[in-house]
């Protein structure tokens, strides 16, 4: 059973706000959103009303019924094919939060995949891909073809970007290697005119790993090598992660480059380097001394992320114990940094820390 990750009451309020209508009262128009109190079954019946606004309001109300909404799923899925774009938006949003029984997962996944690939409205495509990510890869791997097509959608770079992000989740397979279609889509997206799409593409290639298809693998290595030697440091960082993922024996060389990026003055380059180190994990142990140096940085955001990165390395970063202890002892230390440093110390001991604090 899937229940979604969004805050259901908050989403319901958002949906209700989008479905307001005017009512006459004492000669004045009352613009306050009003949704009648009805049973869930009554709202399900309204999903078939000939008036699109009635269907829209029903989709706004149903998420308010919490975990007892599984009986509404078939009717909500049908609204994904609604001729009204606004209703399709609400249907897709509802499927991102409603309780879905195991028996309804295949049909729900297929409905969302169809919207992701075919819907004429970019907003519906985007929301459908976002909703798909609530499902486990075993349930949604069947959507890869649809996501590959969405990664080529010409009318919205955001749709292309989120499609590539979803392909990482559903295209990764540690047993058989990454899905060849997912890797090929990311390779093609490296030529996208939009920087966010190209960034999603390079990170997807880096995270997916080495393809078993020799031809695709050769294309990946060629593209990563070119980017690793290019002038864009952020893309070079992720190209290095990708190359390390292609050949573990070359990791030390690539980690050395990433460690050097921690010393750059550009904040974004530093942050990307730290994120890359967290992805590489234990093999990035040689970066620990440079991460320790960042604990003295004047930028709270850098210090905070240095703590998080050290914590992600667990026992491999144990030489950071004293510097982290010293940092925690500082007077008037910003609370999120103190909590992040405390969590990092716990991780160095192999202990699962408390939930991470919000960023400064």
Q: Residue ranges of each PLM-predicted region?
A:
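Structural detector for internal amphipathic alpha-helices that build alpha-solenoid repeat scaffolds
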Residues: 24-37, 53-68, 78, 86-103, ...
